[in-house]
Amino acid sequence: MRELSVADYMVEFFIANGVTDVFGYQGGMVCHIFDSLGIYKDRIHYHSCGSEQGAAFAACGYAQATGKLGVIITTSGPGFTNALTGLANAWFDSIPVMLISGQVNTKDKKRAYSLRQYGFQEIQAVDMAVPIVKKAYEFDDDTDVVLGLDDAYRTVFDGRKGPVYIDIPINIERNLIKTDDQLKAIEQTPPVTVDASGYIDELFAAKRPIILAGGGISQCGLRDGFKELVELLKVPVVTTMPGNDLIPTDSPYRVGFMGGTARREAGIVLYNTDFVLALGTRMSNKCIGYTHSQFIPKAKKLIRVEIDETEFERQLKDCEEDVVADLRSFIPSAISYAEKIIGSHNHMPWVNAVNEMRKAMSKTDITFGNELLGHFTELLPQNANITLDVGNNLVYSVQSSIIKNGTRMYASAGLGSMGYSIPAAVGVAVGSKVPTYAVTGDGGAQMNIQELNTIAKSRLPVKILVLNNKALGHIIVFQKHYLDDRRIATTEAGGDYHSCDFAALGRAYGIRSYKIFDIGELDQYQDVLRDAEPALFEVEFEDCGMLPNIHGGLDPLTNGPELPKDVLDAVNRIMGF
């Protein structure tokens, strides 16, 4: 046994459980924890971000890229509240994150007083965190720390992953506790076994089956296993936005992502499939539309495989069968069974028809933004990490990016927080140690622009692509549809919106920065895109809108902008309508 401070114990706990990097912002109530991080700097690194929100998003990116625990450390009061948005992001996107914030001395806490506040920068943090975490902890005694940290770590990873919160007073941080000479890693609970054979038989028996794949597959570390399963089943794959990077662009089984901001191809397939096997997706209304009867109207069976049975409280279709299972068991079981009966069924005519339809549709609904992201991602190496923001820049990215082997895309999917891509790129780059590409718009870029300093001072290999149309383009789409195109607070002409010179701003932070006016100009910067130093590219262009903008569930052939007659006729012929 040995004696060490609580702060030292917490840092050793992180090290024992494989955490290599933590993110945060120094403050009075966490000075002891930061001091301990400095003492252990040869075994763990701390990254001081430009704000607590930036640190929280960076921790999300780190956790998504590595599968490890993402740790955020902030001071009390405003430090904690600044990080709440990142905590909410982790909650909705099932990201394994732990937020630790300092708190005033236990003797200065409000306790049972009816006062608004007793200690300086005190806030009722636990009560505020509870709705957006799996569990919140209050370490008011030394004995809370050891058992509490163990339980918090298990809680993050058991079942559906998600964040936890720990509130720790400053006097507890510096107290001494006795512990074992060597801390051991927490063992994670293995998944319950499941037999997937019956569901695979049903898929093979269908005429037009598809797999609907979501971000949960990546969260479970099953990307390679999923690709193996697809190669065995040989059926089309439609993805959600978080699952968009699961299947390479050149795969014969890739259809594309679904939803109101998607291209039409996925909608056409969904409208005509007779069987859906949904893996790793909660099937949100953003994906399937708000009128569930319009979603997969011809399907005779929907099998939803979901680890969180509360998601089944929202029944989507009369034909659905709900399967509570961990994909870590379901996908290996499906692979094992598919290997035994390989060749017994042939859905290649269906696959070929889908590919022919995709080819016929490939030149439709293209904007400058689509062309830009298609060309930009074509220049990137395999295994590229791409972080996305919120707005039309995200739409262009998921619609038109070239997904190569190993490409990963990270976004704020459930919360949909602007300002995500740049700080998330910090965490992804730190965790993956390879060049990371942050795609953002002029609106989102300014939300967490301070993280350019984090990137610059650490010389992180982050390349930022700013799509500067001097407008909030995604909101303009809404204003066109519902508000007679009154562009209030979305353009400079509409009033109270202003963009800036991002290339000049990047240079001010010490980052190589370039203005791009033509897509082809990117070609001369291929070496910059692939080197290990930060860079910023600002592309100025006129707002080009978003196509086709069809609400989820509606027939994509008869809704949205009218398709050319030759394309419509070709699709109808190919799909046999």
Where are these regions (language model features)?
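Thiamine diphosphate
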Residues: 100, 110-120, 315, 324, ...
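N-terminal alpha/beta PP-like core and its mobile active-site loop of ThDP/TPP-dependent enzymes
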Residues: 1-338, 379, 462-464
